[in-house]
Amino acid sequence: MHKELYPVNSEVAKKAWIDEAKYKAMYERSIQDNEAFWAEQAERLDWIKKWDKVKEVSFKKPVSIKWYLGGKMNVSYNCVDRHLKTRGDKTALLWEADNPSTPSRKITYKELHLEVCRFANVLKKMGVKKGDVVTIYMPMIPDTAVAMLACARIGAVHSVVFAGFSPDSISDRILDGQCRFVITGDAGFRGSKVVALKENIDKALVKTPDVQKVLVVKYAGTTVDMKPGRDLWYHEEVKTVSDQCEPEPMDAEDPLFILYTSGSTGKPKGVMHTTGGYLVYASMTHQYVFDYHEDDIYWCSADVGWVTGHSYIVYGPLANGATSLFFEGVPNYPTPSRFWEVVDKHKVTIFYTSPTAIRSLMREGDAAVKTTSRKTLRLLGSVGEPINPEAWAWYHDVVGEGRCPVVDTWWQTETGGILITPLPGAIAQKPGSATLPFFGVQPKLLTNEGQEIHGPGEGVLVIADSWPGQMRTVYRNHERFEDTYFSNYPGYYFTGDGCRRDQDGYYWITGRVDDVINVSGHRLGTAEIESALVAHHKVAEAAVVGYPHDIKGQGIYAFVTLKSGETASEELRKELIQTVRKEIGPIATPDLIQWAPRLPKTRSGKIMRRILRKIAENHPDQLGDTTTLSEPAVVQELVDNRMNR
């Protein structure tokens, strides 16, 4: 059994940036004297021109969020150039390959500077200009961080697409971003499998006629088709350019990147983050949440295709002059000891991973952990979804041997950085709780009707005021931004998560309240999975819900109604799984498919997902009121044939 409360270790508190007294004082000031507080925090970066006004925010329609108005800076300069005098020979990126026998790579800040300048000059030569959107579909190699920083250097907006996404998902994102330039690799590796990146791009580009140039990084050495006039090899182009490139002065509110995330309506949303506020927030949260100090070796095991990789592998750590480890592999290849072997090999001090990875390694037993030393570790972090207390305790007691605080961080693609988290030297930890808000963050709990809940209680989690890392809009669709985040509870940012607050004021995230499933820390819209299923010619209708999954947190449970005359079969089930994998990617593979002759609907024809959720969760005793259904008998039929018992 785990304890309910893990007090702050006094040794940790002594060395930490923030102790309990400082947290309370700084938090109080960040709320009471908000603008002065955020003006001070912005001094951590180098500005070409200081801002005229700290913030201008309205959470009421028309929604507008602006920070550091009139300020000018360059993100690439702040992550690379400004470290050259004092940290030029320090390792910036430490790369560990998928295959443990592949030599690791160290790239110093001096080397990173030259690589970023060269890459930026190749982009310019291709015709990329300030404000252009560039799609990046790359393996987890240092060139990916270089490509992102090169875009930031010349003022281009990057749109990184996770390398596990299918050609259809890539083309959707290219079209939505009106993107004319793509950067990819020949192929990548993941758990010994080859990921055919260039081949996927070629398939995606059939639907995207506006793409003019594709820059291909030679990495895996696979044979790929190169289309003359469109496709360019990076290793050939880079020979023709200079290794110096002046950083473009950018307005604080100029876009830095777009990152697509799942929405409840199906079409992925282009979450847009801007330059100044985003970097202030990524840098500050990286320093204080992970208690980062100059000699730390920091490793976030996420993929750069997700926001965690943007904020806490690339931008936050590099803005702080850190050594950031870039890992190509997976937790269990070639053995379940891999994470801890990498920790020992590179003397990692701070380690940040997902509950899914922790649960999958916990299932393998303690022996795989205990064959390694891990003595350099001093802090552990968790991100992507709520961590169950048992996994938290195993992470703390077995991996961290009871000496490493665990920062269980809650945040979202939309928030740019961590919003609710323990600070290791200041806040006692409760397994499973995200604990308390970060500086300047004002969480509130509301009833479904929008009434604020004071003290302990459970409700919908909203945030009452802006913070610099907040997204500014949905790319080219501000109306959708307002509708999704600001219309349910006017005057607040709606997170889409449910939350409980205990008697100590600690926050416990209870999961999504909208139609989004959190699978292995990755958000998937149920609507996009349903659309993929219904795209099969034998399917009439589909409804997808999440259900508790021991490893992934949530699994995907699909109820499928076939067209009349069609017959369910194991063969068809496999076909449907392949359809979803092709349309969205392997991450969206349904775990369970139940054949449903009919779906429970209200008299107005709306599918009652609440009921389907209870059936999928194996709680047929908690169905609640079914009298509003047009055919109540449907429910018993589904209960009798449920897959998850």
From Swiss-Prot:
Reactions catalysed: acetate + ATP + CoA = acetyl-CoA + AMP + diphosphate
Gene designation per UniProt: acsA
Family indicated by similarity: Belongs to the ATP-dependent AMP-binding enzyme family.
Disulfide bonds: none
Organism listed in the record: Bdellovibrio bacteriovorus (strain ATCC 15356 / DSM 50701 / NCIMB 9529 / HD100)
Cofactor: Mg(2+)
Enzyme class, first EC level, given as a word: ligase
One Pfam family cited in the UniProt record for this chain: AMP-binding_C
Sites of N6-acetyllysine modification: 606
BP GO terms, sorted: acetyl-CoA biosynthetic process from acetate
Protein name as annotated: Acetyl-coenzyme A synthetase
Domain of life: Bacteria
Sorted UniProt keywords: Acetylation, ATP-binding, Ligase, Magnesium, Metal-binding, Nucleotide-binding
Signal sequence coordinates: none
Amino-acid positions noted as binding ATP in the UniProt annotation, renumbered to this chain: 384-386, 408-413, 497, 512, 523
Role: Catalyzes the conversion of acetate into acetyl-CoA (AcCoA), an essential intermediate at the junction of anabolic and catabolic pathways. AcsA undergoes a two-step reaction. In the first half reaction, AcsA combines acetate with ATP to form acetyl-adenylate (AcAMP) intermediate. In the second half reaction, it can then transfer the acetyl group from AcAMP to the sulfhydryl group of CoA, forming the product AcCoA.
